[in-house]
């Protein structure tokens, strides 16, 4: 009799939970329509993989790319709609969140054709790779729209778990296994630190988890200037710092960049920073509204350390991927300037604009590295000597992307940095902007050093890797060149195109 009653209660409780979930999905599902498209694409990938053979492999790429393009289209159709909060306050939809989601989808869309030839040459499992990329993209999109502490923790974990699996995808490579181990251990530690910071914020606000309600709770409890908030700020900054990888939270970055498959590095190098930047702007700007001076100081220290250490250490690197790892540490220092400036002086707009250009510059560089690595099997900077004599298109593409990363006019990187530094100067961040300008000059040095090697014509400097360089006979070579061309064109956008981009970015402010 007791068992019968307990069984009935279990059925009733399960029914209520199911009905509540169905109600939320029915009435709030339209707010996550782009995410639902990706979920449908994931299900379709699994179904095709379980019922198909090797001949259907092109369909896997087609479904993945189509899902991403359709998700981008859904986002664009929803542009300029009124901000909405859905799923009982867990998710917020507005232009600011959506432009970061657009950037993440753009990264993933460009990374899939970039990966095709690499997957074929290394004979990696295709379906699992695409599943991890789409799932990580989904986690990044949910993080951009997260409106409560639980979602802000769960969404990046979804992204991080896929990142760990992708970084160790080449299981037979010792460097890949080492990179995954370091990435996993440090990622787990940073997640613990982040949750600890959330617990202080939760307790200080009187048990609130929604971002805006936390602010109201801090006002009601008079805890907005308490030591607990300072402790929460420090722990949350450290936790988010792992995702952004500024110095001194950068230790994992060079090893993961060097040991992971190159298409994976290309994907992680941009998507993780875009998602973490979206989360950081909302966390610092809303719950820590009353502690703006404190978090400004913390971020200024991180930006200075990142710009100086990242660019100085990059000079000494001999591996192309390790050089880009330290370069990315310096680049995130520039992005942090936009976060500090905020929306009062166009800081967020300049940050979004620069990240858009950074995506094209960085992915274009990695597309060139993937192409060169597959034909030579090397990642050493010295082995790029004389590439112009064998493959002028690849050498010129790499040179343009590197020059744009360095910020030389009239390339896109120059105008992105110019607008970012100008906003910082207007906000009174004179010392920070001065450091940014000096370190940009340093970065130009090591980029030009690589370009000089690319264009050298002296036989004694050309290594056997370039002397024996052969173009790939694979048809998929067209896909990597497609990504490369798109990124190179975007990296060379002249300043005349800056105004409409900045105007669109300005519309994304809160």
From Swiss-Prot:
Q: Which keywords, in A-to-Z order, does the entry hold?
A: Chloroplast, Membrane, NAD, NADP, Plastid, Plastoquinone, Quinone, Thylakoid, Translocase, Transmembrane, Transmembrane helix, Transport
Q: Give one GO molecular function term.
A: quinone binding
According to its UniProt entry, one GO biological process term is: ATP synthesis coupled electron transport
Q: Where in the cell is it found?
A: Plastid, Chloroplast thylakoid membrane
Q: Does the keyword Translocase apply?
A: yes
* Record's bilayer topology term: Multi-pass membrane protein
What InterPro entries does the database record attribute to this sequence? Answer: NADH-Q_OxRdtase_suN/2, ND/Mrp_TM, Ndh2_N
Q: Which Pfam families match?
A: Ndh2_N, Proton_antipo_M
Per UniProt, the enzyme's principal EC class comes to translocase
Q: Does the keyword Chloroplast apply?
A: yes
Segments crossing the lipid bilayer: 24-44, 57-77, 99-119, 124-144, 149-169, 183-203, 227-247, 295-315, 323-343, 354-374, 392-412, 418-438, 482-502
Query: What GO terms fall under cellular component here?
Result: chloroplast thylakoid membrane
Which EC number(s) are documented for this chain? 7.1.1.-
Catalytic reactions of this protein: a plastoquinone + NADH + (n+1) H(+)(in) = a plastoquinol + NAD(+) + n H(+)(out); a plastoquinone + NADPH + (n+1) H(+)(in) = a plastoquinol + NADP(+) + n H(+)(out)
- What family does the entry list? Belongs to the complex I subunit 2 family.
- Complex and partners: NDH is composed of at least 16 different subunits, 5 of which are encoded in the nucleus.
Job description of the protein: NDH shuttles electrons from NAD(P)H:plastoquinone, via FMN and iron-sulfur (Fe-S) centers, to quinones in the photosynthetic chain and possibly in a chloroplast respiratory chain. The immediate electron acceptor for the enzyme in this species is believed to be plastoquinone. Couples the redox reaction to proton translocation, and thus conserves the redox energy in a proton gradient.
Protein name as it appears in the record: NAD(P)H-quinone oxidoreductase subunit 2 A, chloroplastic
Designated gene of the protein: ndhB1
């Amino acid at each position: 009799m007791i068992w019968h009653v307990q069984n009935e209660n279990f059925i009733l409780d399960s029914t209520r939970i199911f009905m509540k979930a169905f109600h939320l999905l029915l009435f709030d599902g339209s707010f996550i329509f782009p995410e639902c498209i990706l979920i449908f694409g994931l299900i379709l990938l699994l179904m095709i993989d379980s019922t198909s053979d090797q001949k259907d492999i092109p369909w896997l790429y087609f479904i993945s790319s189509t899902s991403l393009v359709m998700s981008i289209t859904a986002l664009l159709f929803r542009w300029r709609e009124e901000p909405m909060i859905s799923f009982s306050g867990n998710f917020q939809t507005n232009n600011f969140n959506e432009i970061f989601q657009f950037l993440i989808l753009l990264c993933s869309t460009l990374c899939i054709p970039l990966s095709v030839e690499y997957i074929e040459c290394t004979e990696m499992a295709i379906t699992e790779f695409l599943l991890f990329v789409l799932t990580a993209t989904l986690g990044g999109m949910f993080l951009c729209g997260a409106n409560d502490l639980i979602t802000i923790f769960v969404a990046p974990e979804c992204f991080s778990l896929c990142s760990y699996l992708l970084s160790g995808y080449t299981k037979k490579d010792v460097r890949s296994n080492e990179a995954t181990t370091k990435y996993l251990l440090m990622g787990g530690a940073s997640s613990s630190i982040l949750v600890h910071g959330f617990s202080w914020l939760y307790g200080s606000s009187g048990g609130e988890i929604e971002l805006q309600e936390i602010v109201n709770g801090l006002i009601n409890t008079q805890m907005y200037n308490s030591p607990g908030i300072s402790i929460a700020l420090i722990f949350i900054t450290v936790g988010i710092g792992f995702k952004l990888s500024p110095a001194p939270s950068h230790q994992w970055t060079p090893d993961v960049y060097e040991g992971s498959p190159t298409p994976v590095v290309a994907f992680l190098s941009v998507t993780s920073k875009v998602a973490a930047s979206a989360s950081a702007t909302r966390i610092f700007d809303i719950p820590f509204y009353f502690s703006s001076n404190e978090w400004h100081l913390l971020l200024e220290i991180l930006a200075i350390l990142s710009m100086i250490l990242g660019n100085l250490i990059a000079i000494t690197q001999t591996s192309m991927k390790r050089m880009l790892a330290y370069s990315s540490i310096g680049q995130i220092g520039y992005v942090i300037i936009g976060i500090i400036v905020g929306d009062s002086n166009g800081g967020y707009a300049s940050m979004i604009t620069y990240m858009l250009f950074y995506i094209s510059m960085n992915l274009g560089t990695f597309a060139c590295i993937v192409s060169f690595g597959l034909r030579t099997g090397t990642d050493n900077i010295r082995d790029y000597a004389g590439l112009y004599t064998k493959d002028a298109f690849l050498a010129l593409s790499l040179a343009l992307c590197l020059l744009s990363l360095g910020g030389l006019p009239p390339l896109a990187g120059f105008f992105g940095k110019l607008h970012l530094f100008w906003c910082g100067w207007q906000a009174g961040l004179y010392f920070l902007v001065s450091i940014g300008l000096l370190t940009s000059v340093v970065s130009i040095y090591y980029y030009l050093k690589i370009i000089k090697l690319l264009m050298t014509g002296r036989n004694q400097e050309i290594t056997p890797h370039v002397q024996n360089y052969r173009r790939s006979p694979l048809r998929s070579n067209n896909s990597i060149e497609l990504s490369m061309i798109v990124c190179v064109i975007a990296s060379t956008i002249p300043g005349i195109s800056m105004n409409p981009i900045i105007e669109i970015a300005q519309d994304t402010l809160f």
